[in-house]
Amino acid sequence: MKVFFTLLFVWLLGSTALWGQPADVVWNSQSRNSSGSMPCGGGDIGMNVWVEDDDVFFYLCRSGSFDENNTLLKQGRFRIRLTPNPFAGKSDFRQTLHLKDGYVSVTTPMGQMHIWADVFHPVVHVEVETKEVTSMRVSYESWRTADRVMSREEGLQCSYAGEWPGTVVTAHDSILVGEENLTFFHRNASHTVVDAVIKQQGLESEASHLYNPLRNLIFGGRIAGDLIFSGTRRGHYCETEYEAWTYKSRKPANRQSFRITLHVVQTPVVSDWEAGLEKTEKELHAAKDKEASRR
């Protein structure tokens, strides 16, 4: 009898745990644009994922990525296109946010794509598996290819919101095109909103003693996988101009993947930021990292 009640207690405990888990979020159609995006993240990484015109998109951001105006910037927009496309014209399309394991999947009977963030490393993984042999094209899209004057309305996102100085500029990003990978980063301009506040408060004489978390801040990342550079293009998305750098898979395959490694650090030397990025890349073990992130 004691064994019976013990087993009953264990069963009830397990059932309660399952009942307490929220249901996955499932969409059965593609989105019109980025306003129909699904959140995804892990650790200090956040993404907005959606499928539009059979392409998979996501915005990407990491905590601490504040520019010279104290605006939390997105790292960029990423577009993934498969040929032949397993998501094109499929009535049984599913996009799912798997809440327990923390990833987004896009599936049809012809294939699937998983997008997930490593909980223990600042890395995003994209994994594709298709029934047919497929070619993959990955594009990094940026709207910060030149210094950009911020409008007064946009200023609400930064620390100048209360004391608008008249002209506020978001500095451009840097893009380093490699044959097999793409490196992108934002290096804060020498003059930051912290410097403006120090001047506004009449504290110039104490400036050397005040901590400025925005000075010499560099943040960005690198796209890498079994990819080769394909070319660039320009376009518009949501009334905003952008430039795209595209990489394609070396050869068609049923299984493909790539990763985006991120890094943020305060340093006046870009090579120090690159060294930190490469250190993270060397520490990665995708299979083990996936298992650890979903425990």
Across the structure, where does each feature detected by a protein language model lie?
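Aromatic-residue-lined binding/catalytic grooves and analogous aromatic/hydrophobic interfacial grooves
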Residues: 21-295
